[in-house]
Amino acid sequence: MASTDRSFDGSKVGTRLRSAREDRGISLRELARRVGVSPSLVSQIELDRVNPSVSTLYALVIELGMTMSDVFGDGPATQLIRARSDDDSLVARAETRRVINLASGVRWERLTPHSDPDVEFLHVMYPIGAESCPEDALVTHGGREYGYVMGGTLGVRVGFDEYELGPGSSIAFDSSSPHRLWTIGDQPAHAVWVVIGRAADPRAVSTAR
């Protein structure tokens, strides 16, 4: 497994979400109502005391008009400038990947060296028993997803269909279809995951609970 980026504090995800909410003049209770979770959960996430689930994070990002680059903590404009001048701008080193830790131990490592508004290129890790969201709270958003499982076994539900993906298996689907990921068996799972055009429909509905 890759190392955590020591220059990036993933625990500040909640701080970034709170700043975005306050900048937009949305109350904590109103944001919670829109997302469909309790105000106390939003408060705990903003204080970095609780990691959001994948579905809740997506719902918050959508409601706040953010991008995943905002969540990872960098801006596309400055990163594009750096990409033109940095000799190492094309490479994301294992020890300097940006990381987001989510509920139930799910972990995202960004595989692009800098932010890209059109593509989310991730190494996703699911410990034993982990899930992207509860069974009754599937997530939807704009874009299209592609996944390739490298280790362990992932369950993937898309709409009413469920798939079991072991090492070497891959999947592609429209992200607007309700979907969910979880670990199957007694081994952690990890995969390369790509989302293209998630921000294409910023008002896509997430069914987070």
Locations of regions flagged by a protein language model:
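Short basic helix-loop element that most often maps to the first helix and adjoining turn
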Residues: T15-A32
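DNA major-groove recognition helix of helix-turn-helix/homeodomain DNA-binding modules
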Residues: G36, S55-D70, P76
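Short, charged recognition helix plus adjacent turn
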Residues: D74-R107
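A short hydrophobic beta-strand segment most commonly corresponding to one strand
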Residues: V119-Y126, A172, D186-D201
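Short beta-strand His + acidic residue motifs that chelate non-heme Fe in jelly-roll/DSBH
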Residues: V156-R157, F173, H179-G185
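Short acidic-glycine-tyrosine-enriched beta hairpin
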Residues: G159-S175
